[in-house]
Amino acid sequence: MSEAKRRAAEKAIEYVENDMIIGVGTGSTVAYFIDALGRTPKRIKGAVSSSEQSTAHLKQHGIEVLELNHTGTLPLYVDGADECDPYKRLIKGGGASLTREKIIAEASKQFICIIDPNKQVATLGKFPLPIEVIPMARSLVARQIMARTDGQPVWREGVITDNGNVILDVHHLCITDPVKLEQELNQIPGVVCVGLFARRCADLVIIGSEPPHIL
């Protein structure tokens, strides 16, 4: 599976151009992309990172990490996903960086998602849906989720996001209308971010098959 991730990541380098400032996500597939960025002869101006983990990795390769507030709109954002449906709608947040990932995706002209073939699904929801929550609202949000959906929220104990919040993973969902569910869950007081990327889905999905396939 690591080879599939590497193929997807290296294919994404084809979309990187000299002098770009690019958004960079978080996760095992993105780690391959950062390594490929470090090897490519293309020279970018810098990167906006979605996590402390990716920031450290980018700096190891000598890539300058910039603040989104200082860069404006980005031409390109590259990130992975936990699930991807045929319409390029995603579940993300397994690495607990969903809020910053969603912000950077919204700030980018093109969002390229890189995945291994196992991440493709017909309907989102088999992978538990991560939701970032203000700590004091954890129980309230969990009750609201159970009242509004058939899902079972589970606190991801011991995990604190880079923003100082907690994660609820919602199990046993069958998400037939991701845009609607994203909107509904975002309305619960205490919810910071829902790990559904449906309203702002990927523009392009690179699947690390042999050879890589573009969705």
Curated annotation (Swiss-Prot):
GO terms for molecular function: ribose-5-phosphate isomerase activity. InterPro entries: NagB/RpiA_transferase-like, Ribose5P_isomerase_typA_subgr, Ribose5P_isomerase_type_A. The active site is at residue 101. GO terms for biological process: D-ribose metabolic process; pentose-phosphate shunt, non-oxidative branch. Keywords: Isomerase. Its EC number is 5.3.1.6. NCBIfam families: PRK00702.1, rpiA. Catalyzes the reversible conversion of ribose-5-phosphate to ribulose 5-phosphate. Homodimer. Belongs to the ribose 5-phosphate isomerase family. This is Ribose-5-phosphate isomerase A. It comes from Xylella fastidiosa (strain M12).
